[in-house]
Amino acid sequence: MLAKRLAALALGVLVVGGAASPAAASHGPSVSGALASLLHSAAISEATYHQDYTGYVAAKSSLGRLSGTRREELGAVLANVQAMASAGELIPSRLPALFLTLERNRQWWTTGPLLADDERVSFPGSEIVWEHYPGQGIEIQWLASFGEANGYYLSGDENADLRQLLNEVIPLATRRAGGIAWEYMFHFDGGTPPWTSGLSQGTALQVLARAWSRFKEPAYLAAAQQALGIFQTPPPQGVRVRTPAGAIYAEYSYAPSDRILNGFIQSLVGLYDYTEITKDPLGLALFDAGDAEARAIVPLYNTGAWSMYDQFGESDLNYHELLTEFLQHLCERTRKGQPLTPAGSPAGAQIAGDQIYCTTAQQFTADLHTPPAIALLSRTLPGGARGGLQLSLSKISNVSLTVRQGSKVVWTNSALLERGRPRLLWITPAKGGTFSVSLTASDLAGNFSTTAGTVVVTRP
């Protein structure tokens, strides 16, 4: 994923995602038509119809009075609602989250301040976390919301906040994959709404089970049990991707071929905690399938100097630290050999602790303090060429190049380069000569190293 982002940034084309075009949203039912159809079929009540239809009309009216960024953001959310209606995606269970999103955007963009990219906000009287996705409005940040709930649980003295947050989010789940899922209602990195995530759903499992263990509230256990559906179901409805070893749980339901490790590992942490608390044999089976796959692939994400984000490229600093934390959590659970034996199951049905998660987490922690290894590979270059200098680099780093002829600096360049044998641009002089080259590599954690060498440029 990072490799894709670097390439996109180089071309200046990376965006969160575009709103559905009016043409794309005009082939199926309109929003008002879809709501009316649900009402006439008795799928929704008069009260629900009136609330959602009124909210939709209010948002369209507000849009007409806005301009600039505010109009763009609210317009994108409206376009997403219209596109889902046209695609037949306005099912009854999806309406609460979808129209809450529309109303919160109408409220924010008519009365609130402009927001920075990825800025998070909340509303008075609510514990739900929202995030600004530029060009897509503000959207419910499910991972952050369930993470907030985990924080309330772990503090031990914020039970009222924990209850409020869970009581807010449970009614916002959508019927999906034979169970329920907390869906994202916006375009993101090629994904079209509505989509879901093994990462956020795994965190939901974890905190719902924890809350049930504390409060014995049946609704929390029921929601957690129903949330297992996406882990049993293949994309695009679910996130389960079968593998020779077991299964991997996709971070994005729309991108089953992306093997993003941090989201997968956190989904396993959530499944482990859910199963340890509830003793549910289905949870055990789902964890076992994912655990078998994780033990097979985790070593492949360790380059020896840094972590891989997915099968395509290295992690940025935030994701490296996040993956390390998730691996530490899984290490703590499996190293202790905590049995996950449901009532009535054979005594041997448990997780066998080993060191894969632990040693990898330790190595990733050490990587945060280890300088990159860099070497100059090019020794001779043709004059008047743009081929650049070839380097050897152990991990993703910001690399700076200085070229001197005698005491005179004749060329400088810098770039963020991934590991391997990348090239750094140097347009060599046509007249040739001998040049001193110095390179400095600074990794994403701030560790740096330098190297120097001599390059002979030959005449064309």
Question: What are these regions, as identified by a protein language model?
Answer:
Residues S26-Q141, L154-Y184, Y301:
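Low-complexity, Ser/Thr/Pro/Gly-enriched N-terminal "stalk/linker" regions
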Residues G75-A85, P96, I138-L154, W195-W212, ...:
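Well-ordered alpha-helical segments within folded domains of soluble proteins
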Residues E103-G135, N159-W182, P218-T243, P281-W306, ...:
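Long, well-ordered core segments of solenoidal/helical folds
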Residues A385-L389:
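Structural beta-strand segments of beta-rich domains
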